[in-house]
């Protein structure tokens, strides 16, 4: 028996060593990007990470350089923190990184069929083309402009009423409500209360689930993610199933009554849900759209169109409250271009360069999605470093925006850095993925398709708010902060996006005395 026990012990030890050190064997001899020498069995370098991954990666880049690698369990992860390597990975080697990272939460909550996370291929190309033509193209964006204006006016009325009563407003929640209503009307023709689900989904998408990286824990729910994911799935699926079923019944009733013409929001504009339901009935469609595809796309646009837009507007307001001189300067620009008798509109924004610069500076310091994530689908070489297939890529947009090698005084909120000076093109930095020092929407084929909508909606919303109101910030104990006491917490909360850790609560102050632009919307 004793020799048999020895043999079994040796076999078990060999298996354990093989699985623990398999990453070393598998990649032996390859010139991988620099990596911390010490890593623990099973978890690899996970012990070096905090709850905010982009900040942890930023700190590690100071020690290991602009391109380094980490092991999350047995999974190799590559982190890029400079415009040069961002361009090498997202443009030069774009085809090798044309897929997104799909976690357990992403797969479940997007029905494995979303535009944002679907593998690059025929389905993804078809859905992107459909989305750009029918929802995110210039024609559709312009068609829904009046609806965005209505939601902005509704928020301004709320702020005006609270200003008269000298009552506090949770700006964070009101911005989420507005952006959720906008994308909901564009998607399904009516405002839906989905913002709580959306915030929870974006949070869990960005949280670190060890079961996604360590084979030993694949079937274990050590952090309770499984239950949270299932609860979120049921909440969202119930909501979206009700929406789809209601629309299907409406379509049946119209056909039964012999009615034809536009459906959707009821104002002559077709929403995206109607178009998707048409696709399910089209036998000649190049890709057969099914119910799960519709649910996945609604999830896509609810999460992408609600949280990111609200976050960017809130961060801009925070920075303007902290920097009164910048706030005064942009108000002077608005007064000179728009006047004092009407509200800022989307059509005004191209003529408001300082307002646009404020938005870009906000994206630099507070990108709504702090990292561009990809999965390597084919081994490639970057600057003599080998990136193996199935490696995960993180381009740290947050870190790039705070790098003193590319930005003077990077922690200072200074919109002037984005203004075009006469005879100098240094201020001409676009946000559409061609300038790799500023990538709030990513770059290449997989960049955010909603960039045009965001660049129309956010500056007009921000401009209208600051045109009409000042704000007294409310402290954590309910006190109004004044003078040197105005210290706004800028900590971030973990998640796929980078919202503030604490809601922005303010008492609005009407700077128009109920006249001017607010009088037009009958405040």
Curated annotation (Swiss-Prot):
Molecular-function GO terms, alphabetical: flavanone 2-hydroxylase activity; heme binding; iron ion binding; naringenin 2-hydroxylase activity; oxidoreductase activity, acting on paired donors, with incorporation or reduction of molecular oxygen, reduced flavin or flavoprotein as one donor, and incorporation of one atom of oxygen
Keyword Nucleotide-binding: no
Residues annotated for heme binding in this entry: 448
E.C. no: 1.14.14.162
Entry keyword annotation includes Oxidoreductase: yes
GO cellular component, one term: membrane
InterPro entries referenced in this protein's UniProt entry, alphabetically: Cyt_P450, Cyt_P450_CS, Cyt_P450_E_grp-I, Cyt_P450_sf
Membrane-topology descriptor: Single-pass membrane protein
Top EC class, one word: oxidoreductase
Cellular compartments annotated: Membrane
Listed transmembrane segments: 66-86
Annotated catalysed reactions: a flavanone + reduced [NADPH--hemoprotein reductase] + O2 = a 2-hydroxyflavanone + oxidized [NADPH--hemoprotein reductase] + H2O + H(+); (2S)-liquiritigenin + reduced [NADPH--hemoprotein reductase] + O2 = licodione + oxidized [NADPH--hemoprotein reductase] + H2O + 2 H(+); (2S)-naringenin + reduced [NADPH--hemoprotein reductase] + O2 = (2S)-2-hydroxynaringenin + oxidized [NADPH--hemoprotein reductase] + H2O + H(+)
Pathway assignment: Secondary metabolite biosynthesis; flavonoid biosynthesis
Pfam family name, one: p450
Matches recorded under SUPFAM superfamilies: Cytochrome P450
Inducers of expression: By fungal elicitor.
Superkingdom, taxonomy of origin: Eukaryota
GO biological process, one term: flavonoid biosynthetic process
Requisite cofactors: heme
Keywords attached to this entry: Flavonoid biosynthesis, Heme, Iron, Membrane, Metal-binding, Monooxygenase, Oxidoreductase, Transmembrane, Transmembrane helix
Family in the record: Belongs to the cytochrome P450 family.
Function of the protein: Catalyzes the formation of licodione and 2-hydroxynaringenin from (2S)-liquiritigenin and (2S)-naringenin, respectively. Can also convert eriodictyol to luteolin.
Entry protein name: (2S)-flavanone 2-hydroxylase
Organism of derivation: Glycyrrhiza echinata
């Amino acid at each position: 028996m004793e020799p048999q026990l020895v043999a079994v012990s040796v076999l078990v030890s060999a298996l354990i060593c093989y699985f623990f050190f398999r990453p070393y064997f598998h990649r032996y001899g390859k010139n991988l990007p620099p990596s911390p020498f010490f890593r623990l069995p099973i978890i690899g370098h996970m012990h070096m990470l905090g709850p905010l991954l982009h900040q942890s990666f930023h700190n590690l880049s100071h020690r290991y350089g602009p391109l380094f690698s980490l092991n999350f369990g047995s999974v190799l992860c590559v982190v890029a923190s400079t415009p040069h390597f961002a361009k090498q990975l997202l443009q030069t080697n774009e085809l090798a990184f044309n897929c997104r990272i799909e976690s357990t939460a992403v797969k479940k909550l997007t029905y494995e069929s979303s535009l944002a996370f679907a593998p690059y291929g025929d389905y993804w190309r078809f859905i992107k083309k459909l989305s750009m033509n029918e929802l995110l193209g210039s024609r559709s964006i312009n068609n829904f402009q009046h609806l965005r204006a209505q939601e902005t006016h509704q928020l301004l009325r709320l702020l005006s009423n609270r200003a008269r009563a000298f009552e506090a407003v949770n700006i964070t929640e009101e911005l989420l409500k507005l952006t959720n209503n906008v994308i909901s009307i564009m998607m399904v023709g009516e405002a839906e209360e989905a913002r709580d689900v959306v915030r929870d989904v974006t949070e869990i998408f960005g949280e670190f689930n060890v079961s996604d990286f360590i084979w030993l824990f694949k079937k274990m729910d050590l952090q309770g993610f499984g239950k949270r994911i299932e609860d979120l799935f049921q909440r969202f699926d119930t909501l979206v199933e009700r929406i789809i079923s209601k629309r299907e019944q409406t379509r049946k009733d119209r056909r039964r009554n012999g009615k034809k013409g536009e459906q959707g929001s009821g104002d002559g504009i077709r929403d995206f849900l109607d178009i998707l339901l048409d696709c399910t009935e089209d036998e000649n469609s190049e890709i057969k759209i099914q119910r799960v595809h519709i649910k996945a796309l609604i999830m896509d646009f609810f999460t992408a169109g609600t949280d990111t837009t609200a976050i960017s507007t809130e961060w801009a307001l925070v920075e303007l409250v902290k920097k009164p001189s910048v706030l005064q300067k942009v108000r002077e620009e608005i007064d000179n271009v728009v006047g004092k008798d009407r509200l800022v509109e989307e059509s005004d924004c191209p003529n408001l360069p300082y307002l646009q610069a404020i938005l870009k500076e906000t994206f630099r310091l507070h990108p709504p999605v702090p990292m561009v994530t990809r999965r390597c689908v084919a081994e490639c070489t970057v600057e003599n470093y080998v990136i193996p297939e199935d490696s995960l890529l993180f381009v740290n947009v947050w870190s790039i925006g705070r790098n003193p090698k590319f930005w003077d005084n990077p922690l200072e909120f200074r919109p002037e850095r984005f203004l075009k000076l006469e005879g100098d093109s240094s201020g001409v930095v676009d946000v559409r993925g061609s300038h790799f020092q500023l990538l709030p929407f990513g770059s290449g084929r997989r960049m955010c398709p909603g960039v045009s909508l965001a660049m129309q909606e956010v500056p007009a919303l921000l401009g209208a708010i600051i045109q009409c109101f000042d704000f007294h910030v409310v402290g954590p104990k309910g006190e109004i902060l004044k003078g040197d006491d105005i210290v706004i917490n800028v900590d971030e909360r973990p998640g796929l996006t980078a919202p503030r850790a604490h809601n922005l609560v303010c008492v609005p102050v009407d700077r128009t005395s109920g006249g001017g632009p607010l009088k037009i919307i009958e405040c």
